[in-house]
Amino acid sequence: TTLFRSALNELESFSYSVSHDLRAPLRAIEGYSAILGSDYGDNLDDEAKELLRRVRAAVHRMGQLIDDLLTLSRVSRKALERRPVDLTTLALVICEELRQQDPARPVSVDIAPGLRVEGDPSLLRTVLENLLGNAWKFTGRVAAPEIRFEATRHAGVDAFVVRDNGAGFDMRYRENLFRPFQRLHSDREFPGTGIGLATVARIVRRHGGEVWAEGEVGKGASLYFSIGQPPLQGGG
């Protein structure tokens, strides 16, 4: 077990270093492609312009992937700082940020009051950013999108759950949801790197909890997480 943990730590350190070191050449590619487009765009034919657009799109996607890999590495290395966390307020703030990014979408959001737990505030924010962000994204093709965040009891376990009425998923592949780079939808349908839910799982397990999911294709999804202690609901 000690050797395995040591090897895992070395692998995470390696992943962090590689991801960090990739930033410089990626910035160079982005910068030079921007110069090429702005200074020499008039000399490029339509095919060359399309190829340049694809290069810049690939650079953007690679940048997102690096950011997500660095986040995944950081949540494994960061020391836990447990303190009371108001998840209701945190969720409301995150949903307001999502609305500001996409103000035209009429998403119905229902955040249960009084959701509190003891945990690391910054890491739990990352959990909710990913879960609520996913719900927001995967309801993108629904006429009347709905998202709810609440405390619940599931199979004898006290937990929190983010529910939506979006794209859903095939339950046969639910174990893949929380594995890095495993996606149940194409990037063309719903863009993403496949690292967000793996990050959620790692944070939750560091808190002594667990993550799981239920869903049905075309009918939405429910993503659950526990924090190793009963959720505290109600009160001031």
Listing of model-derived features with the role each one plays in the protein:
Residues 196, 200:
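Short alpha-helical Gxxx[C/S/T] motif in the catalytic ATP-binding
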Residues 204-205:
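Detector for a conserved hydrophobic position within an alpha-helical segment of the HATPase_c
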Residues 57-62:
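Short alpha-helical segment of the dimerization/phosphotransfer core of two-component systems
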Residues 208-214:
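Glycine-rich ATP-binding loops of the HATPase_c
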Residues 81-96, 148-151:
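A conserved beta-strand-to-alpha-helix junction within the catalytic ATP-binding
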Residues 169-181:
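Short conserved segment of the HATPase_c
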Residues 37-48:
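Short acidic helix/loop segment immediately C-terminal to the autophosphorylated histidine
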Residues 83, 103-116, 152:
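Conserved catalytic submotifs in the C-terminal HATPase_c
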